[in-house]
Structure formats: C-alpha cells, structure tokens
Amino acid sequence: MSFSPLKGIRVLDLTSVVVGPVCTWRLGQYGAEIIKIESPDGDLMRGLGGLSPTGQHSGTYLHLNRGKRNICLDLKKADTRDILDRLIASADVIVANMRPQALKKLALDSETIRGKFPDKVYCLITGYGTEGPYSGQPTYDSVVQGVTGMTGLFLRRDGSPSYVPMLICDHVAGEIAAGAILAAMMERNNTGVGSSIEVPMFETMAAFVLQEHMAQQSFEPPVGPAGDLRLLSPQNKPVETADGWIAFTINTNAQVRAFLSVTGRESLLEDERFNSVSARAKNVVEWFQVRGAPLKNKTSEQWLELLQGADIAAQPCHTLETLAQDKHLKSVGLIDHEQHPTEGKTAVIRASIKVDEQYLLPREFAQPKGWETAQLLKELGYSENEVNTMIGNGSALVASS
C-alpha cells in the first residue's frame, strides 16, 4: 500500500512558476488531491522551463506538476467567482504565491477566505512577506539569491558574484511551506481551527545564509569576520585528477589522518597546524591549500577507490549528461519513463522518500491546461448545460484535443 497520509485532503493550488508548485507537488506526494487553477495564458513555466515537443510542457513543468488536477478559468469573467467559491468551500488547504495586493483584489486573500471558513489552512508564499519596506515588490529566485547575499558568497570566494545555476530559493521555500502546512494540518486535527501561514522567500533564505555565515559575528563582541572560512576558501572546490574531478570532504581527525596517508602526505600527520579540529580551524587557509591541491598522479576512479576504501566521503563529480546514468540512481530506479498524452515518451522522477521499505509512488502525469475543467465543474454541482455555457463564453477552458 502506498504511503498516503494526506489522502482525502483537498489542496487548492493558486500558484505558478516554481516555488508554489514545489510546495503543492510535495503535498501531492503524500496523497493530497491537488486542484491547480490555471489562467488562459497558462503557467509561465510551461514554456519558460525549456523546450518541449509541443511548447506546452517544459521538463521543469512536467516534473513539478505531476498528480495535479488541472482546471482552467478566466478569473476576469464574473461567473468564475461562483466556481472559485465552490472550490474554496470544498478545499482543506489553499496555497497561493501571487502578490498580496493581487490576491486582495480577487478576494483570494487569507483574511477574506478564513473570515468565511476559519477551518481552512491558508498558505501564502511571497518574495518579501506582507510587512516591511520590500513588501509587495516582485521577485524571482535569482533576485532572492542576490538580496540574501548568496551571490556575495561567490564574490567573497571567487572575486565576482554569481548565481547558483538552480532555482534553489524556490525549492527551499516551497519545501518549507509544505512543512508548515503539514504542521498546520496537525494543529487543525487537534483544535478544528485552521491557520494563516506566510512564507517569505527573502527571510527564509536570509536565515539559511546567516545560520552558516554569520559565524564569528554571532557573538558580542565578534570573535572574527563574518563567514564560514572553510566554505568560503577558494580551495573548497572539487579536486582535479588525471582525467577529471572528484568531490570529497574530510572533517574528523580520523578522516584527516586517513586522507594524509592515502595521498602520501604522512609528513603532515604530526603538524600542529592540522592535528586537531580546532587547529585546522585556526589555520583554515593553510589547511585548505593542502586538501584542495590537485591529485593528478591518478585517475578519478583510482582515487575514489583509495579514498572510499579509507572510509572517506568521496564521489565523482557528475555533469548534467552523466548524472542520470549514475549506477546508484539506476539501481534504485530514481528515473523511469511514461507516455504523456501530448508530449510522447517523457522522463519520470519519483519522490526520493522511502517509507516502510517502499518509495513513494509517482503521481499521474502533469496535465495539459484545462484537462479536467469539465469534470471538476460537474463535481462542483454544475449541470451539463451550465458547464457548456461556461466553456462557450470563455469563463472556463478545456484542453484542446
């Protein structure tokens, strides 16, 4: 039996792009029914996330919108208000990532919805929250990377700022929002009362950065400069071998001794600069020059055999082209394939969580825009004639055949 603790919970998904879809995707992995409301223009990520056979289901969109029932509504049309009201009444959780002022205009804000339905769990994911001088400003992942100082970490280490080439802020904030919703559902089970949750991306990621890099500035008076000097070392990077690069980390005294022995640097075993955790912290620059030095006298495979044999955490540095072919990922079946109704054969990335010795099963394919519009309208109590009228006047749209 599949692990589905949220079975019977309906989530109304008013989100788009990445951060919100990550949140609702996670809830869907736990068995919740996700109803994704999409505008006639469609979720921006359908095209923005890369090329696809039809131009309507980028890889990113496919992977983050699995298991969601898609209804397409033109919220500018007056008769969609009743549809929204019925959807809200039927839902347990509402998730939105529009700007607060836009939600207020559509009467889709937490105050309005929970004023009518105090048992609802409402989660708003924003760039900057509903307070403070940045509130209401637009943002995207790269902007959050900049304003949180993530780009400044590269400036400090490499001499120029850079973005992490992943939508890391969206993914982190989305997962945190999902966790907050799960906690709110536990509270509702105990009290019968819902919650209004707010997850601002800026504060969320600023806290992540500061938890690691406030470092010596965490004390009054400070005991040193800001920044984890290990992580900010220019030598803290993959190490070059005879035929590529490998990644490894050595932290404990036992790991350091094993590393120095395996790499033929036994002369440093008694060096007082490196013979304890505190000594290496005081001499972090010199230590990282040692551990970051190239290992070009052997191939990556040879070094990995030696390092792993010494119980040192070490693995190859994959490229985007080689990652999916990793022997471990292939063995555990992280990636599979299925037939999509409009895109043909597509990759399926299952959830990485294992419960009671079983991985969570992948949900259904990401649906074309309006795929279940008619079906959901009927489930909400509209007659066949009413459904046809709403489709005919453009209030509701169905997927093209």
Annotated model-derived regions:
Residues 41, 128-129, 201-206, 243-245, ...:
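Glycine-rich beta-alpha junction loops
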